[in-house]
Amino acid sequence: MRLKLLWVGKTQESWVRTGIEEYAGRIRRYAPLEILEAREEKGAQAAAMRERECERLAKLIPKGGRLVLLDERGEAMTSPELASFLSKNRDQGTQDLVFAIGGAYGFTDAFRSQAFKSISLSRMTLTHQMVRVFLLEQIYRGFTIINGEPYHHE
C-alpha cells in the first residue's frame, strides 16, 4: 500500500517542515509515502477559492486511490482505530491510500462526495500547517501499533 498526502499551499514554518521530514522518514520504513502540495488560491471569494483548490487536489489523486479527508466534520478516531484502518486497507489490497488536507476554507461538497472516509484529528480548530505534522505522527504511531513496537502507550 502506498500512502499519499495531499495538502493546499506550501509549508510556511521551518519547524513544521522539520516535523514533516522527521515523521515522513519514519513512515517510509513501513510504506512508500509521497507528499504533494496543491497551489493555494488567493484573492478570490471563499467559495471560489475552495472550488479551485479542490479541483487542484482532485488532479493529484491517483486513479483508484482511496481518498480520506481530514475534516472537522469527520469521524473522530483513536490512535488504535487509525492503526486498524491502516491495517485493514493494507490487507484488503488498497494500492493508494490518499489523505487530503484542505485549504483555509475546507472542501467542496463535490470533493467530499468522492471520499471513502472523512476523519477529524480534533474537535478543536487546528492550523492547516500543524495538521500536517499531527497527521504524519498519527500515521507513524499507527504503523508502530500494527507492528507491536514500543511507541504508543495505553
Swiss-Prot record:
Catalytic reaction equation(s): pseudouridine(1915) in 23S rRNA + S-adenosyl-L-methionine = N(3)-methylpseudouridine(1915) in 23S rRNA + S-adenosyl-L-homocysteine + H(+)
Name of protein: Ribosomal RNA large subunit methyltransferase H
Record family assignment: Belongs to the RNA methyltransferase RlmH family.
EC assignment: 2.1.1.177
Molecular-function GO terms, alphabetical: rRNA (pseudouridine-N3-)-methyltransferase activity
PANTHER family xref list: METHYLTRANSFERASE, RIBOSOMAL RNA LARGE SUBUNIT METHYLTRANSFERASE H
Quaternary structure annotation from Swiss-Prot or TrEMBL: Homodimer.
Organism expressing this protein natively: Geobacter sp. (strain M21)
S-adenosyl-L-methionine as UniProt keyword: yes
Keyword terms, alphabetized: Cytoplasm, Methyltransferase, rRNA processing, S-adenosyl-L-methionine, Transferase
InterPro entries: Alpha/beta_knot_MTases, RlmH-like, tRNA_m1G_MTases_N
GO terms for cellular component: cytoplasm
Protein residues bound to S-adenosyl-L-methionine: 70, 102, 121-126
Keyword Nucleotide-binding: no
Role this protein plays: Specifically methylates the pseudouridine at position 1915 (m3Psi1915) in 23S rRNA.
Pfam families in the record: SPOUT_MTase
Subcellular location: Cytoplasm
